[in-house]
Curated annotation (Swiss-Prot):
Keyword Phosphoprotein: no
Record domain RNase H type-2: where: 7-215
Any single GO BP term: mismatch repair
Top EC class for this record: hydrolase
Entries under PANTHER family matching the protein: RIBONUCLEASE (PTHR10954:SF23), RIBONUCLEASE H2 SUBUNIT A (PTHR10954)
Family note: Belongs to the RNase HII family.
UniProt keywords, alphabetically: Cytoplasm, Endonuclease, Hydrolase, Manganese, Metal-binding, Nuclease
Cofactor(s), by name: Mn(2+); Mg(2+)
Organism: Hyperthermus butylicus (strain DSM 5456 / JCM 9403 / PLM1-5)
Main location: cytoplasm
Alphabetical list of InterPro entries matching this protein: RNase_H2_suA, RNase_HII/HIII, RNase_HII/HIII_dom, RNase_HII_arc, RNase_HII_hlx-loop-hlx_cap_dom, RNaseH-like_sf, RNaseH_sf
Cofactor comment text: Manganese or magnesium. Binds 1 divalent metal ion per monomer in the absence of substrate. May bind a second metal ion after substrate binding.
Name the UniProt record assigns to this protein: Ribonuclease HII
Length: 240
């Protein structure tokens, strides 16, 4: 199949940064510049403003419009082992680099920023060599980031449904959800010595309801020698 060529931008967002259960999902969506209006016409906007049914419908439409997409699922063990802000930046870079490795460089990369937007934009721009727009709430402002947000949310929701089906998990996985907290407390009483693999053990929520599962975070912040990045190391991709 012939590779499609166009001027394009990348939108990147995540779902599941804060939950105590399940992965964090980070998604990059590349869209040709002349197709951005198609996202608007579809009704793409901040995923939190949409129902699960609407998000699921838009998921397929977004992937059909997209030039390219990359989905990264960061499991709880990885989130427990690595500085979260560092990992998120490395994942943004990884996604943009993957897309640019298949297509020409993008016109711009738009990301929903956590922390300092200026520092994030400068770091990513320096590493990627392209214009980076990093803003808090970018998923509310830029349709291309909204698209990434929707895809990430749909994938994250599917992961939680799988955990419900296989392990009986209840609730959304967020520490503010009473059903999630009740389920964790029940599981801890049943099996205090063996925390489920899908629980984030460094989350402070566990100190109160499952102290035997809780571990202090000793976060890795730098890649070992000979690795391109922390994420490359964690994904087992050695520098060539």
């Amino acid at each position: 199949m012939q590779r499609r060529r166009c001027r394009y931008a990348i939108g990147i967002d995540e779902a599941g940064r804060g939950p105590v259960i399940g992965p964090m999902v980070v998604v990059g969506v590349a869209v040709c510049s002349n197709d951005i209006d198609k996202l608007v016409a579809l009704g793409v906007r901040d995923s939190k403003q949409l129902t699960p049914v609407v998000r699921a419908k838009l998921y397929g439409e977004i992937l059909r419009v997209a030039l390219h997409s990359v989905i990264v699922k960061l499991p709880p063990a990885l989130l427990d082992a690595v500085n979260l802000n560092q990992l998120e930046v490395e994942t943004f870079e990884y996604i943009a680099s993957r897309i640019a490795g298949v297509h020409d460089s993008p016109e711009a990369v738009y990301v929903d920023a956590v922390g300092s937007p200026e520092k994030l934009a400068a770091r990513l721009s320096g590493r990627l060599g392209v214009r980076v727009i990093a803003e808090p709430g970018a998923d509310k402002t830029y349709p291309i980031v909204s698209a990434a947000s929707i895809v990430a949310k749909v994938v994250r929701d599917a992961e939680i449904r799988m955990l419900r089906r296989l392990y009986g998990v209840r609730g959304s996985g967020y520490p503010t959800d009473p059903e999630t907290i009740a389920w964790l407390a029940e599981e801890y009483r049943r099996n205090p010595a063996n925390p489920p693999w899908f629980v984030r053990r460094t989350w402070s929520t566990l100190k109160r309801i499952a102290p035997g599962w809780y571990v202090e975070k000793q976060a890795t912040t730098q890649p070992p020698r000979g690795q391109r990045s922390l994420l490359d190391y964690l994904l087992g991709e050695k520098q060539s």
